[in-house]
């Protein structure tokens, strides 16, 4: 369980200190960081974290001029707090030396979950979905037209009148409402 990554180690130490602080101050009200009575758990944890003592790794310089340094590399984000300008320059020199010695640049890894791929997939799906109801509707229309064509001309007119009367009868229901 021992991790050699300094960022992971720093995070674990900070979580341990925060846990100890919360346990120590859970029975008594805090005077260092007053918290309102109606504050939710997240706000209380944020207030406790603000009042927690700062834990430093051995070998870290305490410099008031240090700023946060963020590195984006290989799909990961690394954030270094209190980075001095000298340390940032050294990191940039190291990165440029590592980049220059490689020869031909490597192709970035293919990302499976790209928004463009999802957009194209959705477009294909919707195209298939649109085609399905249209073909289903057209097949019903063709069948109905074929059934009408099979009837003799005299029966077609009679069937049309019957269909009209059926719709009128369904809509009015006159005999039920005449009371």
Curated annotation (Swiss-Prot):
A motif (Jas) lies at residues 115-140. A motif (Nuclear localization signal) lies at residues 117-124. Ubiquitinated. Targeted for degradation by the SCF(COI1) E3 ubiquitin ligase-proteasome pathway during jasmonate signaling. One of its GO terms (cellular component) is nucleus. It is found in: Nucleus. Induction: By jasmonate, wounding, and cold, drought and salt stresses. Down-regulated by abscisic acid (ABA). Keywords: Jasmonic acid signaling pathway, Nucleus, Stress response, Transcription, Transcription regulation, Ubl conjugation. Residues 62-97 form the Tify domain. Its main location: nucleus. The keyword S-adenosyl-L-methionine does not apply. GO terms for biological process: regulation of defense response; regulation of jasmonic acid mediated signaling pathway; response to wounding. The jas domain (115-140) is required for interaction with COI1. Plants over-expressing TIFY11A/JAZ9 display increased tolerance to salt and dehydration stresses. Plants silencing TIFY11A/JAZ9 exhibit decreased tolerance to salt stress. Plants over-expressing TIFY11A/JAZ9 display decreased tolerance to cold stress. Belongs to the TIFY/JAZ family. Interacts with BHLH148. Interacts with COI1A in a coronatine-dependent manner. Interacts with COI1B in a coronatine-dependent manner. Coronatine is an analog of jasmonoyl isoleucine (JA-Ile). Interacts with RSS3. Forms a ternary complex with RSS3 and BHLH094 in the nucleus. Interacts with BHLH062 and NINJA1. Interacts with MYB30. Repressor of jasmonate (JA) responses. Forms a ternary complex with RSS3 and BHLH94 to negatively regulate JA-responsive genes. Acts as a positive regulator of tolerance to salt stress. Involved in salt tolerance by modulating potassium homeostasis through JA signaling and regulation of the expression of potassium ion transporter genes. Acts as a transcriptional regulator targeted by the SCF(COI1) E3 ubiquitin ligase complexes in the JA signaling pathway, and interacts with BHLH062 that may directly regulate the ion transporter genes. This is Protein TIFY 11a. It comes from Oryza sativa subsp. japonica. The lineage of its organism: Eukaryota, Viridiplantae, Streptophyta, Embryophyta, Tracheophyta.
């Amino acid at each position: 369980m021992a991790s050699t990554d300094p960022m992971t180690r720093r995070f674990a130490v900070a979580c341990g200190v925060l846990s100890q602080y919360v346990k120590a101050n859970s029975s008594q009200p805090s005077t260092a960081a007053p918290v309102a009575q109606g504050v939710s758990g997240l706000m209380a944890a944020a207030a406790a974290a603000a009042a927690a003592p700062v834990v430093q790794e051995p070998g870290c310089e305490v410099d008031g001029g240090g700023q946060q340094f963020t590195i984006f590399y290989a799909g990961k984000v690394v954030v270094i707090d209190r980075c001095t300008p000298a340390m940032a320059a050294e990191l940039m020199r190291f990165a440029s030396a590592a980049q220059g010695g490689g020869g031909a640049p490597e192709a970035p890894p293919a990302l499976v979950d790209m928004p463009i791929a999802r957009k194209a997939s959705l477009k294909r799906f919707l195209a298939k979905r649109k085609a399905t109801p249209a073909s289903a509707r057209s097949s019903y229309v063709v069948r109905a037209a074929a059934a009408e064509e099979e009837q003799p001309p005299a029966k077609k007119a009679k069937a049309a009148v019957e269909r009209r009367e059926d719709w009128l009868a369904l809509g009015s229901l006159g005999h039920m409402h005449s009371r």
